[in-house]
């Protein structure tokens, strides 16, 4: 093939600057559309993950709290099942070893919110249970269903918990608020 030879009729034509600009503009439009779709998909995924995280965290905390509330007061009647009836803290008691004393590890369990971490202390210090807790509220009720602040009169407990993800989701606020009411079985 001779590179200096005259062009043949079936050779590709020349590309002008206008043709290049039109092609570049079309590529930019298609690229912008693809980027927009990918970005919206990423945002939807992040929102869904944040929602799932907050719901799972709240459910785990309420499940553990509910289970411990149901067995509070086990092992005797010489003590209150709820030791402290505070709106921001929950202190439960049970006699696990049957010695009549609330002294061994696990016999007095404290739940409290420290910063944005819900913590539990069963004798080994405050251990983190759930991160990202925005609010933790405890309401105590007597046998008639009236609110009470007397630990000995508590027969049921309502727990309200609101959680947020540990990270921020751009363009939205993800929060899960759950409430449950649990009756003490041993009182």
Enumerate the language-model features and the residues they cover.
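A generic secondary-structure signal marking the coil-to-beta-strand transition
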Residues: 34, 88, 155-157
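Aliphatic-rich helix starts adjacent to a transmembrane/signal segment
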Residues: 2-71
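Short linear sequence signals and composition-biased patches located at protein termini or domain-edge surfaces
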Residues: 2-5, 96, 126-187
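Type IV pilin-like appendage domain
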Residues: 83-146
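Short amphipathic alpha-helical segments
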Residues: 33, 77, 104, 172
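Short, glycine/small-hydrophobic-rich surface segments
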Residues: 46-47, 52-53, 67-96
């Amino acid at each position: 093939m001779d590179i200096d030879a005259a062009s043949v009729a079936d050779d590709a034509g020349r590309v002008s600057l206008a043709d290049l600009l039109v092609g570049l503009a079309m590529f930019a439009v298609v690229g912008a559309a693809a980027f927009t779709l990918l970005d919206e998909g990423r945002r939807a995924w992040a929102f869904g993950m944040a929602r799932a995280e907050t719901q799972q965290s709240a459910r785990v905390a309420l499940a553990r709290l509910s289970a411990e509330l149901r067995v509070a007061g086990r092992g005797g009647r010489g003590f209150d099942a709820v030791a402290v009836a505070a709106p921001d803290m929950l202190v439960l008691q049970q006699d696990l070893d049957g010695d009549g004393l609330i002294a061994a590890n696990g016999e007095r369990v404290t739940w409290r919110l420290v910063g944005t971490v819900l913590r539990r202390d069963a004798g080994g210090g405050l251990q983190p249970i759930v991160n990202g807790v925005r609010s933790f509220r405890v309401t105590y009720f007597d046998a008639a269903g009236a609110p009470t602040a007397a630990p000995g009169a508590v027969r049921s407990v309502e727990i309200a918990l609101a959680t947020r993800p540990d990270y921020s989701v751009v363009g939205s606020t993800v929060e899960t608020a759950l409430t449950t009411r649990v009756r003490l079985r041993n009182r």
